[in-house]
């Protein structure tokens, strides 16, 4: 089977990309799927992508870019700075690369190498649990 070279950028509402749509994308040679909304893919769609070896970028990691840019804007405004597009783009790239690395490393550490959904979930859990522990909550 040859893989297609095109990209598909879908921005759905919650649970809109289902297993049938996932299998259609797989059959047509999709290489990677990155969620661009909050939970747009059903669990069965995600499973289909993972079983087919398709790189899958989960919403919680992929959507962090919007949150990161908002934080950069707040930092820029509070410091009365004016960053160029290139500066913001570089900072965002670094943030997103770090999110990928943390997610990939967490997945690998827990025996799920390549499973970015698992890695993002574990990394998020570990960050929250560490904060709770440091605050004496648990």
Each model region followed by its residue ranges:
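Active-site environment of divalent metal-dependent phosphoester hydrolases
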Residues: 15
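Adenosine-phosphate binding glycine-rich loop
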Residues: 10-12, 23-138
């Amino acid at each position: 089977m040859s893989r297609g070279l095109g990209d598909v950028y879908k921005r759905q509402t919650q649970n809109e990309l289902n297993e049938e749509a996932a299998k259609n994308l797989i059959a047509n040679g999709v290489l990677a799927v990155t969620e661009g909304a909050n939970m747009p893919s059903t669990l069965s769609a995600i499973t289909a992508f993972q079983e087919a070896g398709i790189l899958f970028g989960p919403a919680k990691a992929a959507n962090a870019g919007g949150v990161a840019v908002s934080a950069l804007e707040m930092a820029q405004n509070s410091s009365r700075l004016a960053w160029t597009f290139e500066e913001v783009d570089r900072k965002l790239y670094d943030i997103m690369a770090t999110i990928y690395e943390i997610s990939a490393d967490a997945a690998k550490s827990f025996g799920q190498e390549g499973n970015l959904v698992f890695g993002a979930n574990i990394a998020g859990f570990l960050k929250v649990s560490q904060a709770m522990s440091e605050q004496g909550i648990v």
